[in-house]
From Swiss-Prot:
Belongs to the AIR synthase family. Pathway: Purine metabolism; IMP biosynthesis via de novo pathway; 5-amino-1-(5-phospho-D-ribosyl)imidazole from N(2)-formyl-N(1)-(5-phospho-D-ribosyl)glycinamide: step 2/2. Pfam families: AIRS, AIRS_C. GO terms for cellular component: cytosol. The keyword Metal-binding does not apply. The keyword Transmembrane does not apply. This is Phosphoribosylformylglycinamidine cyclo-ligase. It catalyses: 2-formamido-N(1)-(5-O-phospho-beta-D-ribosyl)acetamidine + ATP = 5-amino-1-(5-phospho-beta-D-ribosyl)imidazole + ADP + phosphate + H(+). CDD domains: PurM (cd02196). Its main location: cytoplasm.
Length: 338
């Protein structure tokens, strides 16, 4: 059985590491009016009647697939998506970003391709890239690493933290474009080690190559989610389904649970990974499994929310009173608890 930990990423150890880091930082929160602390998708700082939302994220080991294919023109889209999708989760409109590119040695051609993707992603998200940092770090970095930090703005009385999520609320899932930018270490282990495929090989059950599927850009949810937020729909919570899978819903409110029994069929890439030996619970713990973003709304507003979000959005379950538990019906028919 292939696991994420065996692929080099230990989720439990990462959580302990983050806790160890942030436990030393809480005393600094006294220096500004912080509304949300560590652990939410984005941090909020009050500036009068408006709050600034901030988030930082990176592309991760998807960069290694780009290196294998010598194709860097889409990873910039992923970088933008990972940041702006998190900012959306507090009800804020993403506004601007700065990027960070660390390289083993400068390569103008590769940098130009990355810049092309960043510009495309910024257009999709309607954000400005206002600066950044490029660092040459031989001995520390092998090839390159790409990340960004973004800000957004939201009126204080329009902030969405998830505290209004209540049992009986409906969870709406917005489809992903594919694997997005999480779980790539496990996916690479499966395709390139277990199945012994190359990036150019056709992915089983698909007309696309393995590399094309792994590099498919992360979907940017700014347009549909901002339209939802600015409507009359009573939005109680928003969650970006990234690392940790549907466990990300537990970041909204600790004393409620979720029952997800109407999930859409995951894309073929996830089926191939599962059939190659990854346990189905591990699949839902690591990957988005076809749903890249969730909106939790009042039951009376479901129809209006769906009309706004379009045909790539589906009711996938409801909020329960089982504190901090996500129970879902997997694509195999099994019931899984996260």
């Amino acid at each position: 059985m292939v696991t994420y930990s065996e692929s080099g990423v230990d989720i439990d150890l990462e959580e302990l590491t983050v806790s160890s880091l942030t436990s030393r930082l809480s005393d600094t929160l006294k220096y500004c009016d912080v509304i949300t602390g560590a652990g939410h998708f984005a941090a909020l700082v009050r500036m009068g009647d408006v709050a600034i939302a901030m988030s930082t994220d990176g592309v991760g080991s998807k960069i290694l697939v780009a290196e294998m294919m010598n194709r860097y023109d889409t990873v910039g889209i992923d970088c933008i998506a990972m940041v702006v999708n998190d900012i959306l989760c507090v009800g804020a409109r993403p506004a601007a970003l700065v990027d960070y590119l660390a390289v083993e040695r400068p390569d103008p051609e590769v940098a130009g391709e990355i810049g092309k993707g960043l510009a495309m992603g910024a257009e999709m998200a309607r954000v400005a890239i206002i600066g950044g940092e490029t660092a040459s770090l031989p001995g520390i970095i092998r090839n390159l690493d790409l990340a960004a930090t973004g800000i957004g703005f939201v009126d204080v009385d329009r902030i969405i933290t998830g505290e209004d999520v209540s049992p009986g609320d409906t969870v709406i899932g917005l489809e992903s474009s594919g694997i997005h930018s999480n779980g790539l270490s496990l996916a690479r282990r499966v395709f390139f080690d277990e199945l012994e495929l190359s990036p150019e090989d056709e992915m089983p059950g698909s007309s696309s190559s393995v590399g094309d599927e792994l590099l498919r850009p992360t979907r940017i949810y700014v347009e549909p989610i901002m339209e939802l937020i600015e409507s009359d729909v009573d939005v109680h919570g928003l969650a970006h389904i990234t690392g940790g899978g549907f466990g990300n819903l537990k970041r909204l409110r600790k004393d409620v649970g979720y029952r997800l029994d109407s999930l859409p069929e995951p894309q073929q890439i996830f089926r191939v990974i599962h059939e190659a030996g990854v346990d189905i619970r591990e699949m839902y713990r690591v990957f988005n499994m076809g749903v890249g973003f969730c909106a939790v709304v009042a039951p009376d507003d479901v129809d209006e929310a769906l009309s706004i979000l379009g045909d790539r959005a589906h009711p996938i379950g409801e909020v329960t009173d089982r504190g901090s538990e996500v129970e879902l019906e997997a694509c195999t028919g099994e019931t899984i608890k996260l």
